[in-house]
Structures are given as C-alpha cells and as structure tokens.
Amino acid sequence: MAFAAGYGKTNVDLLFENMSRLPNEGEEIFTDRFSLCLGGGIPGTMVTLGRLGVECKTVTELSKDMFSEFALGEFRKAGVEPVNVYHGDKIAVNITAAAITPNDRTFVSYGNEENSVTADEVYNALKGAKAVAMHADLPEVYKKLKNDGTTVILDTGFIEGMTLEKYKDLLEIADYFLPNRKETEILSGTSDPRQAAKVFSKYVETPIVKLDKDGCLIYKNGEYILVKSIDEFVRVDSTGAGDAFFAGFLYGLMHDEPIERCVLFGNITGGKCVTAVGCTTAYFNEEELLEMAEKYKDNIIYNY
C-alpha cells in the first residue's frame, strides 16, 4: 500500500496558557490551563496526515524518556509508524515550554543535536514511499528517492540567513516547494508573488507561494491560479499552520488530485490548525476534510 514519509526531529511542547504575566526571577506563578502536545516539524505533519487516514511513516529520534514515550504514543494514536534512528543516550526529542500571556508567548527550549544517524539509514527508512517530506539536510537522500520515483516536497520553514543559493541543490531536487510569503520574498528577492513564482519556476515545474491569509498562488502551465483561504476559521494560534498545510497538501498528492485541489486541502488543514493553541491540537478527519473541500471548491480561481 502507498505510504507517505518524512525525516525530522520530534518536538514536544508544554503549553502554560492563561497566564496573567511572566514570573520575575525567583518567583513561581500558577495557571489553571496546561497542555502537553506534539510540536511542529515533519513528525507533526505526519501526525496530521495520519489522522486523515493516510498510511505514513515518520523517521525520527526517540530515546527512553517520558517525552519520547509521549511522542511515541501520539504517533501510534494517529496511525503513524515511527522509525527510530537515534543512537545516543540523552533525551533525543526537542522540548519547549511556552508561557502564554495575553500579549505574547515566551519560550524555553531544550534540544540535543548529538546523533550519529547516517544518510543510508534515512534513505533505507524512507525508501518505497510514494511521497516524502524533505528535510533541509541530506540532499543526496532525496536525490536517490526521486530517482526511485518518489515525489519529494520541500517546505523548509524560515531559517535565519536563508538564500536561494544555499537552497539551490534542494530546489533542483524537489518536485514541489512550499514557501510562505516571508520565505518567498527572501529567496526570490521580490515582494511580487507572481514574479517570485516565475523565479521558482526555474527549479520546480509548478511553483506554489503561500500568501498567509490571502491563500496560495500557483503557477501552472503558464497560468496563475489563486486558492483562497478559508474565511470561517478564527485564528487563535498560528503555530504549526505550515506543517498542517503540508499534511493537507500531501493528502492530495497521495490521492493523485490536481495540484490546485492539493493546495485547497492544505488551506483547510492549515486553517483548522490555527483555531486552537498548539501545533497538532485542532485537526480534521478524512470525512470532514472532504466535506470542507466540497463546500469551498469555488475557492479555486483559475486564470487569476
């Protein structure tokens, strides 16, 4: 059976909500709202995709600690097969504690970069997938996968100092690239989405530019297509929206849908994500997604 897959670090978020203020040094403040959830990144994308009924695999790093055990449980509940490639003896997952006040969010994070995972391990774990979410590293892995016939999709997220030259090797491998507005402007050197799409068309056949609340612009066979965002969603927390969009987009690819339908699915899953605090808290099942896609089919505007 066809499956989707991706390699990336697992993130676990501890969310302290409804805080009136941050504590001063030496103080302790209590809140009555706390949640523990999976954070963003490729494993989070696979969880949202698994909840849509797609068979998927996340290649990641887990250790023998309570946070890794929590993540493992979340993967299994979503129907995601975890493949552990961690070889160390520390806590392998990234952990973020977020203090959420009325005006802002403040973070304290832990991350362990120590690991000896090899490109061959990652390739062997991803081999055979119909579609793979690309990591910012290991271009040789994705080149081999593409040569195998796997569709490879790049969504890097914002990285300080990112340039088109730095991402050239990955873009030349990717079948699809999913930058948001900020990433698009930095990489293309223009604030005009149409011109940016033409810049990206030198690397990918069908450029896609995410325009945040304005939807997504597709440049397909010389035609611009706008897929509008979903107006009914009320934003509570935008964290994880890009990862959720990626899941909806992958759902469409896994079902051989036209690219504009893939983007519509992405707008729906990404829009749903922002209606609750946390990267993987708010989501649709497959039936709900298809109902929403039918309801908003006219959000696809051709010859834009």
Where are these regions (language model features)?
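Glycosyltransferases and closely related glycan-assembly transferases
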Residues: 140-152
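Conserved phosphate-binding/catalytic region of the ribokinase-like
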Residues: 5, 193-304
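Conserved N-terminal subdomain of the carbohydrate kinase-like
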Residues: 27-29, 51-131, 148, 290-304
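Structural detector of well-ordered beta-strand residues that form the stable sheet scaffold
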Residues: 5, 57, 133, 153-155, ...
